[in-house]
């Protein structure tokens, strides 16, 4: 019996410790001396411009690298991104994605694509609703992406098409550990050479769970396009 009581006490302590860690992490984000901000888990497929409820002075550099084997050549993707908040609740972003290609030895004479700066992407996001009491945030935003010609044909034309993407984000935290988020908006593609305009509509829904006592998340995302 004493052993059972001791084990029970140890488990209870561990649970309290993790709960306290979760609360401390949330309190660190939702500092009362600062403008209102709610901790939310962000999706991976969709890159938010800044945290929902961004505070003035926040800034961040991001670098990304990727490698894809295309059978006859390898493609290397590199991403440079800078995002910042010039004022409370307003986030801005500039992104430059590059793709570089390297032919393989046995490519059968297949022509390797030209290296390219894929696009220049500029974006803004305004958190128009942030409520710590109900742990809910909402934001509207706009992404404009100028897609460029590859380096071999650079300037002929320089901009091949324009992509317009207004969007809405709604996020809510349930208790300390459960998070949900919906990101949605139309994507309008304007082909400069043909003058054609194509429109699609995206919805990203995500559900995440913050592992107690850590800052790590596990979750699932659903991406739908019409």
Give the predicted meaning of each segment.
Residues 15-226:
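Transmembrane beta-barrel domains of Gram-negative outer membranes and organellar outer membranes
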Residues 1-18:
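Bacterial Sec-dependent N-terminal signal peptides
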């Amino acid at each position: 019996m004493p052993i059972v009581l001791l084990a029970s006490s140890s488990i209870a302590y561990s649970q309290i410790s993790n709960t306290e860690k979760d609360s401390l992490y949330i309190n660190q984000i939702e500092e009362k001396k600062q403008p209102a901000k709610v901790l939310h888990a962000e999706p991976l497929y969709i890159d938010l411009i800044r945290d929902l409820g961004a505070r003035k002075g926040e800034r961040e550099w991001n670098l990304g690298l990727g490698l894809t084997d295309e059978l006859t050549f390898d493609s290397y993707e590199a991403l440079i991104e800078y995002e910042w908040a010039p004022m409370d609740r307003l986030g801005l972003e500039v992104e430059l994605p590059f793709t570089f290609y390297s032919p393989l030895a046995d490519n059968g004479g297949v022509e390797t694509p030209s290296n390219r700066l894929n696009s220049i992407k500029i974006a803004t996001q305004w958190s128009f609703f942030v409520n710590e009491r109900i742990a809910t945030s909402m934001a509207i935003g706009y992404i404009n992406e100028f897609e460029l010609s590859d380096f071999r044909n650079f300037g002929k034309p320089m901009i091949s098409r324009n992509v317009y993407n207004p969007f809405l984000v709604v996020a809510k935290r349930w208790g300390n550990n459960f998070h949900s988020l919906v990101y949605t908006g139309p994507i309008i593609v304007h082909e400069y050479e043909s003058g054609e305009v194509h429109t699609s509509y995206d919805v990203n829904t995500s559900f995440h769970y913050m592992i107690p006592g850590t800052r790590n998340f596990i979750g699932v995302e659903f991406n739908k396009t019409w």
